[in-house]
């Protein structure tokens, strides 16, 4: 192993092809897109230099600003939720759990390895759009909170938060394992 890591030819043999593929697939399109963003026109026809006019028009667009606001909320809530829940779970593993520690850690980490389609189907059933049909609405109804029964993913006021809960649940196990490893 040390022989390979000390050999610059061996390192180049592994790194250079990957860099070439990455440059062709990722970097070239990013640079082209950035270059084309300073022009107006149709591809193959007439192109005019627009400077920063395209960006000025973008930041005046209400739809773009709304999408940017929603994305910022999502990133903030999901990041804080995943890291915060992961930290709390890792502290629970270290200082509170005495029995069944391995089983609980496995169950908490399980959503990380679930396929995205399975998680989507699971939460589609939990947040079922028809009231009183999904798991969450049935639970709320049986506990007497009938005024909270609603289509969770079907309305703009609750859809973002429902998706945030799903993403936090999926990734908090990963962060809990990372933090738990740091606590050991």
Language model segments and positions:
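A structural signal for multi-pass alpha-helical bundles of membrane permease subunits
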Residues: 3-184
């Amino acid at each position: 192993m040390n022989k390979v890591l000390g050999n610059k030819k061996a390192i180049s043999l592994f790194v250079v092809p990957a860099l070439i593929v990455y440059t062709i697939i990722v970097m070239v399109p990013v640079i082209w897109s950035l270059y084309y963003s300073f022009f107006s026109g149709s591809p193959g026809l007439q192109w005019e230099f627009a400077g920063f006019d395209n960006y000025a028009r973008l930041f005046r667009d209400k739809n773009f600003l709304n999408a940017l606001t929603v994305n910022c909320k999502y990133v903030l809530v999901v990041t804080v939720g995943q890291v915060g829940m992961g930290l709390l779970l890792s502290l629970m593993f270290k200082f509170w759990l005495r029995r069944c520690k391995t089983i609980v850690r496995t169950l908490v980490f399980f959503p990380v390895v679930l396929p995205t389609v399975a998680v989507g189907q699971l939460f589609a059933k939990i947040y079922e759009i028809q009231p009183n049909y999904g798991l969450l609405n049935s639970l709320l109804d049986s506990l007497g909170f009938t005024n909270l029964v609603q289509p969770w993913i079907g309305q703009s006021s609750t859809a973002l938060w429902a998706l945030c809960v799903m993403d936090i649940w999926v990734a908090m196990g990963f962060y809990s394992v990372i933090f738990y490893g740091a606590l050991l």
